[in-house]
Amino acid sequence: MSGGRRLPEPPLLVITDRTMTERPLADVVEAAFKGGCRWLMLREKDLDATAREALAAEIMAVAKPYGAQVIINRDYAASADGIHLPQGCSVSEARRLVGPGGLIGVSAHSLNEARSAAEAGVDYVTLSPIFLTASKPGYGPTLGLDGLRQIADSIPTPIIALAGVDADNAAACLKAGAAGVAVMGGVMAAADPEAATAALIDRIKRVQTSRQPSG
């Protein structure tokens, strides 16, 4: 069963990778916030615990003026808004750490993994790889829009489409049943992260607007 906590709006999850950026990560993150991002995953798994904690504090300070939510991949920082888990981690233990209001997400690459995460009570599932991408190798064949649609139709938990998502296909992901989309390289490696973020959000909002009843 889904945790049921409301996801940030707009439903664009920007995932960090400082090895892709041409500027300090905090600068790229702030550019994404200026472009309209309100949901960020800090994913810097190569850093040791002390360095990750320091970077998390810096990024959360950048997020605060924008009202953006920051979740941490694998770890949890006391002032973060949630945690994102790989497969096999305890969702109940994560809930104990983040409290009743924190977001908990899990990575999935198949229907079975997505269903297990949903049954554990997570708030969202990142599903990948939807499309080919250099930043998510090694996870088998792409699911495509048909695979995304099948899995989104099979579980109640919001699905966040990940891998190869860009401004050209974000709308198609939402129309296939994704509750939102996630991007890494499309923002982290962009020459203009603010513009790249704004373009993605524009596509998302167009779909949202088209679903609103007229009159």
Regions found by a protein language model. Give the residues of each.
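A short acidic, helix-capping loop that chelates divalent metal ions and anchors anionic groups
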Residues: L42, F131-P137
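Short, glycine-/small-residue-rich phosphate/pyrophosphate-handling segment
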Residues: L143-R149
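Acidic/glycine-enriched connector segments
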Residues: C89-S90
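Short, solvent-exposed loop/turn segments at secondary-structure boundaries
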Residues: K136-G140, P193
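Conserved N-terminal beta1-alpha1 strand-loop-helix module at the mouth
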Residues: M1-H84, R96-D123, Q150, P156-I159, ...
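Non-cysteine beta-strand/loop elements that form the S-adenosyl-L-methionine
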Residues: P86, D123-F131
